[in-house]
Regions:
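Alpha-helical solenoid repeat scaffolds of the TPR/TPR-like class and their adjacent stem/linker regions
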Residues: 1-410, 579
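PAPS-dependent sulfotransferase catalytic domain
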Residues: 168, 202, 211, 216, ...
Length: 579
């Protein structure tokens, strides 16, 4: 049978049965083999429409909605083994990869979808989102513009574009875009929520609360909005709010995403009300549900610390004197999340010579690329691969980091801050490729810090934080990693204890600026008056003078923190400030 005969047969088949996803997909494959990509795209588009009635794909889709990723994945992989060009299934597998934070895998899958079916608009939207989450703003905006050419008034596209603009610090443009969309189409709860996020970032708390409330009025069960209100830290829920959240949890059709967000929000509401037992129960449920949705190997941190300690010795660094890019611009603030890094950033960003940015993903992405791991089951070549890098390669990597982060710099200040906390995993890389960069370790009492993590739902990353024992193990690994670098590179890392800052703000600020080689400026003590945008969970706390309340909030919950204390072990014993 000739290719033309095959196409004629398949066209006759789909004419008889237009709901056959397999028939349309086979026709798309046939047109692809003939090189007629326009006809293939049209056939794949019909396959996508027909697939919405496919029982197998519906089962996978329902599992994704319910957050049952372990159920969805084998269905989709079996499907693609039989039909490798099923673009609907490939797109769903990409969604699964994205949910797991495997954005590189998701990107490859979506690129394949768009190669087969360039007119698959939902896949292109997913592609833009994945590019955005990998900090590739220019590429994401290019995909959004392709979609917007046909749908200029699509609120979902405008919402994503505004989020991308906000990610690169173009906050006013993002706010203007949100406002224009909502003026035309006010019944958009997700856009109101995103607008609230942007308003919070620039310090317009009252407007953010109003935007979040507009979203709730449109969709009362939208868990992320309730959590966003709770996450403002300075909003107190009333009895009606608590009843509304409890009522939403009773809905049978509530999504897994809405459900765990509501548990976190109710945990905060009941904590503020002083009902600590009920509060902890909700925090525990929210964390357990979120933990079931993420992949995390608690042994990875200990393995990484052991491998790093074996590699990064005094002899290793002595043999590489003069390696790397000598630019002194970056200031890395790292450590555990919720340890005071945003406070340190706000203090330093109030200095005339320092620009604050955000938690930049560029260094971990460079490390991941060096590791070369394609599958989670594979071993990473990182950090040992660093021993093979030449002086020129180290300099090139330092220059790459500076180029990648340039889009975040909006002023002519000579220094800028990267406050990705997890960069403590990459101190060896920093010292190798950016030897003149400064490194600051933000510390807070392990129980206060870890329980603050447990109460916090992170939009992405920090998968270690959803189980008390795993959280303690991660914190222990962090302290061991820092102790190693203190031993092999004394003085390379400046440590700032949150408790010391509370006790003596000016003294700690002067010591910090001295480490950075910067003159003292009074503005650093009045950091809370800064109008700069702040994107992290501590955004509202750093807009007020320093407070002591956060030091002992964990004590209300200490009867439930046994697994955390046991896992922390020596990290708890060795902390220099008493509880």
């Amino acid at each position: 049978m000739t290719a033309s005969d095959t196409i004629a047969r398949l066209e006759a088949q789909v004419a008889r049965d237009p709901q056959s996803a397999d028939g349309w997909r086979a026709l798309g494959d046939a047109w692809t083999a003939r090189g007629n990509m326009a006809a293939a795209d049209a056939a794949y588009a019909q396959s996508i429409r027909a697939a919405t009635r496919d029982p197998e794909l519906l089962q996978a889709a329902n599992a994704l909605v319910a957050g049952e990723l372990a159920v969805a994945e084998p269905i989709l992989r079996a499907r693609l083994k039989r039909a490798p060009t099923d673009v609907a299934a490939i797109r769903m597998l990409a969604e699964l990869a994205s949910r797991l934070g495997r954005y590189g895998d998701a990107e490859k899958l979506l690129a394949r979808v768009l190669q087969l079916a360039p007119g698959f608009r939902a896949a292109r939207h997913n592609y833009a989102l994945v590019l955005h989450r990998q900090n590739r703003a220019g590429d994401a905006l290019a995909q959004i513009d392709i979609l917007a050419a046909e749908e200029p008034d699509n609120p979902a596209l405008a919402n994503l574009k505004a989020a991308v603009l906000g990610r690169i610090g173009e906050y006013e443009d993002a706010l203007d875009l949100y406002a224009r969309v909502l003026e035309r189409q006010p019944a958009q709860p997700k856009v109101w929520m995103s607008y609230g996020h942007a308003l919070k970032t620039v310090g317009r708390q009252g407007d953010a609360v109003e935007a979040y409330r507009r979203a709730i009025a449109l969709e009362p069960g939208m868990g992320e909005v309730w959590w966003s209100l709770a996450n403002l830290k300075r909003v107190t829920f009333d009895a009606a709010d608590i009843a509304a959240m409890q009522g939403a949890l009773e809905q049978d059709d509530l999504s897994a995403d809405d459900r765990f967000h509501l548990h976190f929000a109710l945990g905060k509401a009941l904590e503020d009300a002083g009902d600590y037992a009920a509060s902890f129960a909700h925090y525990a449920q929210g964390n357990a549900q979120r933990r079931a949705m993420v992949r995390y190997d608690p042994d990875e941190i200990a393995t990484h610390v052991t491998r790093s300690a074996a590699l990064f010795t005094p002899a290793f660094f002595a043999a590489r004197q003069g390696y790397g890019c000598p630019t002194p611009d970056p200031i890395f603030i790292l450590g555990m999340p919720r340890a005071g890094s945003t406070l340190i950033e706000q203090i330093l960003a109030s200095h005339s010579l320092v620009e604050g940015t955000m938690e930049l993903p560029d260094l971990p992405q460079i490390a991941a690329r060096l590791g070369g791991r394609k599958l989670r089951s594979q071993d990473s070549a990182y950090p040992e691969i660093l021993a093979d890098l030449s002086a020129q390669e180290c300099a090139a990597l330092g220059e790459e980091y500076l180029e990648r982060t340039r889009i975040q710099r909006k002023t002519d200040a000579p220094f800028f801050i990267d406050k990705m906390p997890n960069n403590f995993l990459h101190i060896g890389l920093i010292r190798l490729i950016l030897p003149k960069a400064k490194i600051i370790d933000a510390r807070r009492h392990p129980l206060a810090c870890c329980f603050s993590n447990f109460k916090q739902h992170f939009a992405r990353g920090q998968a270690f934080s959803y189980d008390l024992a795993e959280l303690g193990g991660y914190c222990l690994g962090y302290t061991q990693a820092m102790a190693h670098f203190d031993a092999v590179q004394p003085g390379a890392v400046h440590r700032v204890f949150y408790e010391a800052v509370v006790d003596d703000l000016e003294g700690e600020v002067r010591r910090l600026l001295g480490f950075l080689g910067l003159p003292f400026e009074e503005a650093c003590l009045n950091y809370h008056a800064s109008e700069r945008a702040v994107r992290t969970a501590s955004s509202e706390q750093v807009r007020q003078p320093i407070f002591r309340e956060g030091l002992n909030q964990w004590r209300h919950y200490q009867e439930w923190l046994g697994p955390l204390k046991a896992a922390l072990g020596p990290a708890l014993v060795d902390y220099p400030f008493a509880t």
